[in-house]
Amino acid sequence: MQAFFANPAVSWTLLTTGGILLVVIWVLLSLAFLLLADRKIWAGVQMRKGPNVVGPFGLLQSFADFFKFVLKEIVIPAGADKVVFILAPLISLILAFVGWAVVPFAPGWVVSNLNVGILYLLAMSSLGVYGIIMGGWASNSKYPFLGALRSAAQMVSYEVSIGLIIITVILLAGSMNLSTIVEKQSGWIWNWNVFGGGLNNLVLLPVMVVAMGMFYISALAETNRPPFDLPEAESELVAGYQVEYSSTPYLLFMVAEYSNIVLMCAMISVLFFGGWNPGFPTDFLSSWHPFAANLFLALVFYAKICFWFFMFAMAKAIVPRYRYDQLMRLGWKVFLPTSLVLVAAVAAWRVFGPAA
């Protein structure tokens, strides 16, 4: 038995499987309480209480909703393509979770430390729209199909800007490894990429602040989040691509959507706000137990994710929905040329600046 566990292939498989399970459990538990927080924030803006019945302060509301969804009957429309109809939410959910494989929670706390992790994240976030397109087409109904087409157009429009903004971070960090990008931002708060990545690069502060703002807005559009929730606009498409879904498949779509939102919050934290770095030197952690030190840094990272989720929730609560033509105009006529200028500015500084 000891020889079996000493086998490198076996130990790697067990460690990777354990890491995947831990991340999935963490994401699911986080979604349960962040979804409640989203509803509470929305209620607070509208001067009402929000969910407050199930459990103390309504803390168990998400778990009650889970049982409500799971125990309902799965209704499949008569004219729907049954296989694709059921596969669509599963594909959306899987693609929403696989992106977490390269997110570094603390030094060494990452499922797969890929050297091209940032490209992997970009690819996974792009593929998520296929589940929505499949669901809209398989429903054999006008509203879901229109919602799916809107989602595809929206993703294409804003994925370009997200990719170009990521290039500015790659130019600053000199790496596509997410752990390396975070490590480059260690030390004081001015080493974070949003401030230019160090005092020597402080001239890039306005460039990176604009890049961060554009990334945040593009992330709202990428995740079909208000004010860019055109694929599920209630006043036009009832519920968009989710119209014909009920019970567990609907729940899977909702979990996938919120998982993508939290993943985008994690990306903003990693790319611009130092990831697990608290904004001051962490030399004092050398005297701590390694697990305790990493747990502290992981909590710092989680606090940043929660802050950005709060920003997503506030955008949902206070910003009115854009019209479809305004959404496209913003993506192609404003964000695309601006992001190209930002890439050129950072590249010029890296080539001709004092640190060249």
Swiss-Prot record:
It is a multi-pass membrane protein. The keyword GTP-binding does not apply. Its main location: membrane. GO terms for biological process: aerobic respiration. InterPro entries: NADH_UbQ_OxRdtase_su1/FPO (IPR001694), NADH_UbQ_OxRdtase_su1_CS (IPR018086). Its EC number is 7.1.1.-. Belongs to the complex I subunit 1 family. NDH-1 shuttles electrons from NADH, via FMN and iron-sulfur (Fe-S) centers, to quinones in the respiratory chain. The immediate electron acceptor for the enzyme in this species is believed to be ubiquinone. Couples the redox reaction to proton translocation (for every two electrons transferred, four hydrogen ions are translocated across the cytoplasmic membrane), and thus conserves the redox energy in a proton gradient. This subunit may bind ubiquinone. NDH-1 is composed of 14 different subunits. Subunits NuoA, H, J, K, L, M, N constitute the membrane sector of the complex. This is NADH-quinone oxidoreductase subunit H. It comes from Caulobacter vibrioides (strain ATCC 19089 / CIP 103742 / CB 15). The gene is nuoH.
